[in-house]
């Protein structure tokens, strides 16, 4: 079966069409703007899979309807999913704009004095607003000379932010969310909303009962040679932690081996269900070999599976990580308990950064007073105002131990194409695999246990659905925190010390939900959240605006907020603008 091609970014150089001197004098400068934009994007951005982003430039500069149509024909044939229009001069507004209502679009008007690029930018944006097709404005802060071919830093920042978010939109369109199972323990996010996926993300939902996973395991619908490789890899790399179960619930060596085997098989089969596996076709299992074209998935697990079979912790942790027995590779997006809305936040984070995501319960707010009462020690540094305990039963990406290193030697989580095998091994070495607690998981399993290194910048996100309003996005930038060992051990033991922990301190603003750490916890909209590496809340805000998902909570600096120009016409309060604009335009793929 032919592999689906990756979306490309189309560059549209537009120009003043008057011949006899005007157009001729602008051709080279205009096309050079397009080439410079393409070169910047190709150099600085990759797809989430690690592939280089391909830019497609119109064959000619665009002066009017005919050349605009020719450009559109070229883009349509080359899977262009995002467009950037560039110009240093006046052009004919509505005659030259990109009219595709579902394709993210931006316009860069060169800030120069010789020709009025700003005037075209304003005229074109007015046309976009009047026609109900929002576009992003890019206009440099400082005037440039006509022969200056450099891209100013502020223009570069907007071009790249737009491109990252636009590619995320284009990459999700046409894919599916694989819902393995149904509603887990009444968790609202696992009440999978097909309309949300279809109307806001352009995705489908593939609902599959957990018996399909059981069938694949029992009937050996998997690569048996790969299973042996996975088992050998686990034998070499897994370090087992304490079994805290009562003696009557402890398993013997043979039983533990069977649990490990099934856990690895679950990872393989969920992966195959998501993306397919041509090895299955070689076994005559052509239908199963195709997969479900899933860019994200969720596994219900609790309780209808986990009361009888090994839990999904090992499978989810390995799939969500940037490495396994096949080496370093792109992480998958698999939501615990089939929390599809947390899965979407994971998907956003992965598409924007190319990194693995940490799925966690937003479990406990620890005030400075409570910590001192319990441990006899005071919180300090980033943690001085209190911390949030992010912990789940073991499905977080192993990258979350932060044993990878950036260019300055600091702990981080890298895009998978930058991760060395040594860094992957370090993450594995920092992880213990603890037998699942019987009271929670009667069918057994292994939970990954690690502690995230401190001082690492993170962005915590969550998508919620509000009846009568639709989806909203929450964002909280902050840092992981390293606690003194004795303090960590005492606090961790009060929850479940066999699970992975991140101590998180959000950046406070003194206002609203970021008045203090307690307010962040109190305003969080659900029991789950996602950690994405870096302070990338601004990218999430831009992506949300493209999809028409309002942001109900964030602590991103106002100067970094980048939304379509038409948002400014929806009032003077920028967050109110966001709500009104999203309501006015409706979901991107509304029918």
Swiss-Prot record:
Keyword Disulfide bond among UniProt keywords: no
Residues of the active site: 337, 361
Enzyme Commission number(s) from the entry: 5.3.1.25
Required cofactor names: Mn(2+)
Root EC class: isomerase
Positions bound to Mn(2+): 337, 361, 528
SUPFAM superfamilies, sorted: FucI/AraA C-terminal domain-like, FucI/AraA N-terminal and middle domains
Keywords: Carbohydrate metabolism, Cytoplasm, Fucose metabolism, Isomerase, Manganese, Metal-binding
A Pfam family per the record: Fucose_iso_N1
Main location: cytoplasm
Catalytic activity: L-fucose = L-fuculose
Matches recorded under InterPro entries: Fuc/Ara_isomerase_C (IPR004216), Fuc_iso_dom3_sf (IPR038393), Fuc_isomerase_C (IPR015888), Fucose_iso_dom1_sf (IPR038391), Fucose_iso_N1 (IPR012888), Fucose_isomerase (IPR005763), Fucose_isomerase_dom2_sf (IPR038392), Fucose_isomerase_N/cen_sf (IPR009015)
Protein name: L-fucose isomerase
The species this protein was found in: Salmonella typhimurium (strain LT2 / SGSC1412 / ATCC 700720)
